């Protein structure tokens, strides 16, 4: 009996001519963020133009963009350029951030290992932490002058306490079972610190560093407002004296970019460090002490 073959086109399977269903366009998080930024900037520009808001009060976005482009196009070697003032402020931020964070972390390590010392220092740390640092800035400038040293000292003061407090909390938050497990394996105090306490404290330390990064930018501008010869804070004061509000907003953008870059670098380092951390000692079958 001969088999009957289906005729071409008689099968129910779709051919290449069948139109494919189109998937709905979906925007990612970054696309939505960019779209929101465009809408906000467009609304800003349109609102200022429609309501005839004076430029010295709220400049249009186009004026801010022109001022920013003019500042970026200037020679980086000119002492009145945006690049020169930015380099001064970035130097102050980095020096103050690293010095203040390092001191806060070092003292946090020592204090967390000595409960009695922590109890003695706790009221003084609380009192100094609640002290408004902006009010102390003029005194620091009087002590250290208008140079970079006074700004670094102000930034150190602002970044010291977040790292100190979070590092102490992190070293105290270690699981006691991990300590007991390592001690049962005859681990030395240094090995306990390296394999249990320090890994447990890392998330707390990075949280303090992220807060300190934001405070570092604020501290640099406060110090330059109080007394400085160069820096973005000085540039803002000069532009405000000339009623150049668009130029001031362009400096605000540069400061925001500096803060974003610093926090992004910290976040990348945090992801890399925490990703390559050894597994929890309590969950390992063997611990190489």
Question: What are the language-model segments listed below?
Answer:
Residues 95-125:
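Transmembrane-helix boundary motif in ABC transporter permease subunits
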Residues 153, 157, 190-223, 254-255, ...:
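Transmembrane alpha-helices
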Residues 233-270:
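Hydrophobic alpha-helical transmembrane segments of polytopic membrane proteins
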Residues 1-36, 264-289:
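Transmembrane alpha-helical segments of polytopic membrane transport and secretion proteins
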Residues 163-211, 232, 236:
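Short cytoplasmic-facing helical segments at TM-TM junctions of multi-pass membrane proteins
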Residues 22, 50-98:
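Periplasmic/extracellular loop-to-transmembrane helix junction in inner-membrane transport proteins
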Residues 82, 86, 90, 120-127, ...:
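Hydrophobic alpha-helical elements at and bordering transmembrane segments
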Residues 126-162, 169-170:
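Generic hydrophobic transmembrane alpha-helix motif, especially the helices
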């Amino acid at each position: 009996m001969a088999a009957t073959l289906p005729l071409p086109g008689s099968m129910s399977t779709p051919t290449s001519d069948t139109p494919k269903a189109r998937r709905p366009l979906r925007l990612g998080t970054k696309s939505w963020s960019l779209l929101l930024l465009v809408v906000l900037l467009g609304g800003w520009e349109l609102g200022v133009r429609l309501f005839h808001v004076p430029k010295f009060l709220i400049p249009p976005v186009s004026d801010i963009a022109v001022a920013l482009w003019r500042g970026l196009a200037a020679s980086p070697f000119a002492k009145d350029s945006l690049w020169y003032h930015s380099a001064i402020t970035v130097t102050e931020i980095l020096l103050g951030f690293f010095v203040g964070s390092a001191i806060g972390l070092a003292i946090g390590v020592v204090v967390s290992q000595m409960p009695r010392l922590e109890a003695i220092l706790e009221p003084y740390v609380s009192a100094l932490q609640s002290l408004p640092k902006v009010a102390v800035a003029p005194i620091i400038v009087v002590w250290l002058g208008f140079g970079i040293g006074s700004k670094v000292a102000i930034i150190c003061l602002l970044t010291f306490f977040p790292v100190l407090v979070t590092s102490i909390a992190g070293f105290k938050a270690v699981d006691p079972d991990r300590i007991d497990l390592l001690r049962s394996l005859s681990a030395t105090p240094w090995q306990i610190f390296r394999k249990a306490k320090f890994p447990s404290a890392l998330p707390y330390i990075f949280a303090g560093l992220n807060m300190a990064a934001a405070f570092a930018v604020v501290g640099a501008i406060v110090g330059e407002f109080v007394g400085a010869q160069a820096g973005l804070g000085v540039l803002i004061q000069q532009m405000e004296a000339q009623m150049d509000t668009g130029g001031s907003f362009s400096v605000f953008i540069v400061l925001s970019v500096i803060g974003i870059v610093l926090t992004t670098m910290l976040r990348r380092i945090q992801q890399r460090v925490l990703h390559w951390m050894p597994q929890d000692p309590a969950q390992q079958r063997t611990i190489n002490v």
